Amino acid sequence: WREYEKQADELVIELDPGRAFGTGSHPTTSLLLKLMEEQDFTNKTIIDIGTGSGILMIAGKLLGAGEVYGTDIDEFSMEVAKENLLLNNISLDEVKLLKGNLLEVIENKKFDIVVCNILADVLVKLLDEIKYILKEDSIVLFSGIIEDKLAEVISKAESVGLEVAEVKEDKEWRSCRLLVKK
């Protein structure tokens, strides 16, 4: 555990990642958190696909999201996410944490913001499902993309009706903000 003195303009997330992914220190997580900070989450409906430690759900809630969903296929990650939500004073009644594949657990729901920090090969597969949960003005924030896989992710995203608005980089890792094509 690290002690940290919060600055006046900061939101601080407390985490015990256990064996779940997402401590905030990995470049993919920090890149996605930076992208999240640049968006307006006020009263938005968001989903964190592959929630892991729950760090992105927590960030979304702290940034003002109205409805926050998180999905994961791993039972252990679900437990870690629950613990971390509670550690950050977020009641499990305030969020929806769902175990299972995306379209199996999300029925007829559309989201303003989709966040996902998973390896590129998984992102490419998920895009076929993500397209069904987007609104006309949704924002999609992806991370977990190694440099040489970025073109593949972008190509797939474009094939399902998204366009790249921004790419951030840290060492060999890439993160991107995607918008629904008008």
Predicted feature descriptions by range:
Residues K34, I73-K181:
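S-adenosylmethionine
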Residues A8, V12-E14, G50, T71, ...:
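Generic hydrophobic-segment detector
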Residues W1-G22:
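Non-catalytic substrate-recognition/targeting regions of SAM-dependent transferases
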Residues R19, T23-L102:
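Conserved SAM/SAH cofactor-binding pocket of Class I
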